[in-house]
């Protein structure tokens, strides 16, 4: 890490910038279609020397599927492993993240993992709280603590945009309710889920989340354990096997670190015991990952020897 400098990051951004022209915005969520496809930013948060950043690293964007890691950690804290994995599986899937196929063809009929939409919805339904306001406040408090940013909130504009068009997610919920995976009110769950996905961060926030997971839940700046080590281990394992949608296998080969992406263009990754990386690039490849973000992580991993394999 010590050899990575801001100038080096800037050069890498310029090197991969042309890839943004090959990607597309996630226009199926109307608000995400308003992003600038040329935006590209990165931050790296180290355990000792704080962070370096380059490009559009302070532009706000929504977590989207990155929030699945946050809520998984919270659900495991609330309910424990036995309950969580009685409702959601641990296996990767070759299907799209919003597919219903495996719910229909797998026995018992439960989502294969917490990183696909069906699994993430089931996880969100497990969060403790008397109502959605309390549950959302717990999610925000958790994100604020691991980012050390008390100003973090969610975009009601993005949440409303998602809620209006989330027909497929609703169908996943109704199917799971029919099969006893969830038992809550569907519209209440959809409201909470779209809000969790609409939590706004920048690359620096995302890199700090990556650092906490890289340090097995320990915050080296606050000098305290924020997330139990065994929970971060579970989360990082899912990040390796399922974190990059249907490119998780290729990402493991080309980059080789635990990472999670979201369709707003964010990616966060962690290098064990050392650093967290946060990237923003809203131009996506065919699998829903930041096309330039993937490339810059590939180059950095090759340069720095990050791969865990």
From Swiss-Prot:
Q: Has keyword Hydrolase?
A: yes
- Where is substrate annotated to bind? 65, 117, 162, 169, 193, 245, 263
Per the UniProt entry, the Enzyme Commission number(s) are: 3.5.1.2
Q: Which reaction does it catalyse?
A: L-glutamine + H2O = L-glutamate + NH4(+)
Read off the Gene3D superfamilies from this record: 1.10.1500.10, DD-peptidase/beta-lactamase superfamily (3.40.710.10)
Q: Which UniProt keywords apply?
A: Hydrolase
Q: Name one GO molecular function term.
A: glutaminase activity
A Gene Ontology biological process noted in the UniProt record is: glutamine catabolic process
Stored SUPFAM superfamilies? beta-lactamase/transpeptidase-like
Signal peptide (residue range): none
Under the heading InterPro entries, the entry gives: Beta-lactam/transpept-like (IPR012338), Glutaminase (IPR015868)
Q: How does it assemble?
A: Homotetramer.
User: What PANTHER family does UniProt report for this protein, alphabetically?
Assistant: GLUTAMINASE (PTHR12544:SF29)
Indicate the family of this protein.
Answer: Belongs to the glutaminase family.
This one is known as Glutaminase 1
């Amino acid at each position: 890490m010590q050899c990575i400098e801001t100038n080096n990051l800037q050069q890498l951004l310029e090197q991969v910038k042309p890839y943004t022209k090959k990607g597309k915005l996630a226009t199926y969520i109307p608000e995400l279609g308003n992003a600038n496809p040329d935006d590209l930013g990165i931050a790296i948060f180290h355990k000792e020397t704080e962070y370096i950043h380059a490009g559009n690293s302070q532009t706000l964007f929504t977590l989207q599927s990155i929030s699945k890691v946050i809520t998984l950690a919270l659900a495991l804290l609330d309910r424990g492993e036995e309950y969580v994995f009685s409702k959601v599986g641990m296996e990767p899937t070759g299907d799209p993240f919003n597919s219903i196929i495996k719910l229909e063809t797998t026995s018992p009929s439960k989502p294969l993992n917490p990183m696909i939409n069906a699994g993430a919805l089931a996880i969100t339904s497990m969060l403790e709280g008397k109502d959605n306001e309390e549950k959302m406040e717990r999610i925000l408090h958790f994100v604020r603590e691991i980012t050390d940013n008390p100003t973090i909130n969610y975009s009601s504009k993005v949440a409303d945009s998602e809620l209006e068009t989330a027909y497929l997610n609703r169908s996943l919920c109704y199917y799971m309710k029919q099969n006893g995976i969830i038992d809550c009110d569907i519209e209440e769950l959809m409201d909470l889920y779209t809000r969790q996905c609409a939590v706004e961060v920048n690359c620096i926030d995302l890199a700090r989340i990556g650092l906490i997971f890289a340090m097995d839940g320990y915050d080296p700046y606050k000098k305290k354990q924020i997330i139990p080590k065994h929970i971060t281990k579970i989360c990082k394992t899912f990040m390796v096997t399922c974190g990059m949608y249907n490119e998780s296998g290729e990402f493991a080969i080309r980059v080789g670190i635990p990472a999670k992406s979201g369709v707003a263009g964010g990616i966060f990754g962690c290098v064990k015991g050392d650093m967290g990386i946060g990237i923003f690039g809203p131009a996506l490849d065919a699998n829903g990952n930041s096309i330039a973000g993937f490339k810059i992580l590939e180059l950095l991993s090759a340069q720095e020897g990050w791969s865990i394999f």
